[in-house]
Amino acid sequence: MYQLSVCLFLALISCSTGTEQEMNIDTTITNKDVIMEKATFGAGCFWCVEAIFTELKGVVSVEPGYAGGATENPTYKAVCSGTTGHAEVAQITYDPSLITFDKLLSVFWKTHDPTTLNKQGADEGTQYRSVIFFHTEEQKYLAEKYKQQLSESGAWDNPIVTEISELMKFYIAENYHRDYYANNKDNQYCRYVIQPKVEKFRKVFVEELK
């Protein structure tokens, strides 16, 4: 059911280079009688993660930020130093009637390499670790189940090292990180790292695009 191509993962991999605000981590928000849900993933640079998940049908918004560390109100510079314990993450607000958490997990695992510890492509450090921060026990169950099935599938020679932890606090990243790929497509990192990943993602998930 979850047969994946190792080549796809290796081709889709790699992100790095105001005022910070702690974000409410409630699982749901209500808008016009539709209950939205949230998912929080780390898969390398949050510019890459944001660029991919923004294009999915059912995704309302994607917010880059930091989670998983002990430092309060972390800055991008501090997180990049690798001393805060935080990972670069994207917090996704989505409509569960249009896209499921399972589908988000599928996109998550198919657009980065979950077998490289604290590393995605050329980006190295704990801030780039593969991680799922669950909001509910159901999300935890689904993430662990999917991870186990992938591990048993033999898709990779190396073990999956994706961390699955409860989300305690989420800190919104500085404003210039938002819509970074959309606003900086001439940037070399965007052209040579993010764009190829986005293009491959579009081919694999063509039926799920907005």
Report each predicted region and the residues it spans.
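Bacterial N-terminal signal peptides
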Residues: 3-14
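Flexible coil/turn and secondary-structure edge motifs
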Residues: 15-210
